[in-house]
């Protein structure tokens, strides 16, 4: 039995590669079922965000190569290209990695809380797909518990920062007074919701939320006193926007160079600040070629968050210690779990012997034997049969020179120098 955590993230792969290896919500269930069908994987879950695509697996033996080959084939890129930026963690290292990810210790923004919710969503989708069972399920529950402990027992979450907060911080650097700025937010998911709240707190003059469905855009807009439009209405609104921040799950770009050029003309080339948080990207990279556009992607946010990270570095060590403890606790419980099946089988074996010997004793009594004789026969039968298999195996192992088996037997049966301890 083996646990694996493999994939790519913002530290190992560029945004170009990450967007090619990303899974859309619509792909997830079938991808999980296909993964379990065509690779030697018993249980699986997929976490796909703008900063990482990771697979969490339970296999009988480590078969990472087969999974990487499937991942490359699924996303139509070469195996060599994927291997160049992929990582594979096995067993306790896989457990530790999952717990670090869920705790925000492996995030672009140290300690950011959104990743835990994203991991819980990944677990829920895996349950829907039927690809997660008792073993991976236990690992997810242990991961969530450790992440909660990290969040409550350390200062890792203080001075809240996130990709959303970093985007707004960058906007504040470019526009000294956000209260005179107008913002267009594309999408209505968790990240855009956080962006909207941060902008609202900064007193942005006007916020417009554009989404594929008006219902979700309206719900977010109502919360903040903003305006809601459909994606199709963006060209009519774009020229009003000083700030454009986009994060959707679209497979195709939402904004192209031509649309932005038209908006700039209507703005008389007043600068526009744009942040594309999506993977795959919502805003064509060519937009960044325009003179009056400041276009940033998630990979450009590193410097913005550097200052905020300093305040969390002290808490990171305490968080790492909690993750190490959580990892060891889970692995210990897993080792104990491995003994359960053996103990269950041995108990069933002992109960069969007990039932057989009890039946013999009852027949002796029915045939007129004394209770003393029946009990003596029962005791001898139980002793001989319970000791028979261990005795045969110990002699065999001793003859083979397996002296460690004798020491283990003494420990197993709590024997000391060949006799039972009083």
Swiss-Prot record:
Which superkingdom?
A: Bacteria
Q: What are the EC numbers?
A: 1.2.1.70
EC supergroup of this enzyme: oxidoreductase
Please name the GO terms that the record assigns under molecular function: glutamyl-tRNA reductase activity; NADP binding
**Residues at which substrate binds:** 49-52, 107, 112-114, 118
Q: In which pathway does it act?
A: Porphyrin-containing compound metabolism; protoporphyrin-IX biosynthesis; 5-aminolevulinate from L-glutamyl-tRNA(Glu): step 1/2
According to UniProt, the reaction catalysed is: (S)-4-amino-5-oxopentanoate + tRNA(Glu) + NADP(+) = L-glutamyl-tRNA(Glu) + NADPH + H(+)
Q: What is the residue range of the signal peptide feature?
A: none
Q: Which residues form the active site?
A: 50 (nucleophile)
UniProt cross-references to Pfam families, sorted A to Z: GlutR_dimer (PF00745), GlutR_N (PF05201), Shikimate_DH (PF01488)
The protein's matches in PROSITE patterns, at most eight in alphabetical order, are given as: GLUTR
Q: Mention any additional remark.
A: During catalysis, the active site Cys acts as a nucleophile attacking the alpha-carbonyl group of tRNA-bound glutamate with the formation of a thioester intermediate between enzyme and glutamate, and the concomitant release of tRNA(Glu). The thioester intermediate is finally reduced by direct hydride transfer from NADPH, to form the product GSA.
What job does this protein perform? Answer: Catalyzes the NADPH-dependent reduction of glutamyl-tRNA(Glu) to glutamate 1-semialdehyde (GSA).
Supply the NCBIfam families for this chain.
Answer: hemA (TIGR01035)
What name goes with this protein? Glutamyl-tRNA reductase
Q: What is the lineage of its organism?
A: Bacteria, Pseudomonadati, Pseudomonadota, Gammaproteobacteria, Pseudomonadales
């Amino acid at each position: 039995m083996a646990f694996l955590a493999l994939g790519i993230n913002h530290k190992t792969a560029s945004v170009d590669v990450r967007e090619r290896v990303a899974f859309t919500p619509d792909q997830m269930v079938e991808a999980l079922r296909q993964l379990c069908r065509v690779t030697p994987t018993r249980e699986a879950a997929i976490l796909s965000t703008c900063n990482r695509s990771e697979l969490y697996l339970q296999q009988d033996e480590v078969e990472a190569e087969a999974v990487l080959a499937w991942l490359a084939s699924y996303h139509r890129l070469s195996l060599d290209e994927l291997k160049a930026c992929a990582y594979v963690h096995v067993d306790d290292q896989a457990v530790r990695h999952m717990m670090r990810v869920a705790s925000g210790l492996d995030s672009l923004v140290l300690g950011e809380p959104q990743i835990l919710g994203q991991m819980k969503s990944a677990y829920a989708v895996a349950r829907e797909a039927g690809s997660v069972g008792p073993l991976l399920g236990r690992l997810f529950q242990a991961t969530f518990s450790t992440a909660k402990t990290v969040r409550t027992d350390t200062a890792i979450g203080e001075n809240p920062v996130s990709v959303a907060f970093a985007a707004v911080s960058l906007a504040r650097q470019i526009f000294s007074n956000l209260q005179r700025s107008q913002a267009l937010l594309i999408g209505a998911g968790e990240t855009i919701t956080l962006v909207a709240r941060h902008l609202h707190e900064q007193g942005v003059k006007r916020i417009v939320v554009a989404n594929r469905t008006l219902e979700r855009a309206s719900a977010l807009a109502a919360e903040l006193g903003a305006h809601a439009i459909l994606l199709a209405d963006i060209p009519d609104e774009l020229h009003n926007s000083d700030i454009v921040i986009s994060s959707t799950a679209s497979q195709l770009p939402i904004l192209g160079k031509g649309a932005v050029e038209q908006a700039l003309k209507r703005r008389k080339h007043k600068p526009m600040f744009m942040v594309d948080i999506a993977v795959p990207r919502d805003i064509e990279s060519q937009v960044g070629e325009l003179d009056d556009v400041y276009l940033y992607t998630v990979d450009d946010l590193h410097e913005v968050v550097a200052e905020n990270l300093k305040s969390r570095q002290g808490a990171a060590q305490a968080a790492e210690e909690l993750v190490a403890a959580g990892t060891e606790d889970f692995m210990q419980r897993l080792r104990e779990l491995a003994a359960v099946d053996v103990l269950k089988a041995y108990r069933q074996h002992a109960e069969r012997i007990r039932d057989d010997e009890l039946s013999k004793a009852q027949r002796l009594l029915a045939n007129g034997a004394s209770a003393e004789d029946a009990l003596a026969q029962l005791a001898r039968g139980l002793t001989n049969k319970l000791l028979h298999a261990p005795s045969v195996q110990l002699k065999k192992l001793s003859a083979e020179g397996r002296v460690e088996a004798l020491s283990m037997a003494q420990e197993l049966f709590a024997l000391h120098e060949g006799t039972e301890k009083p």
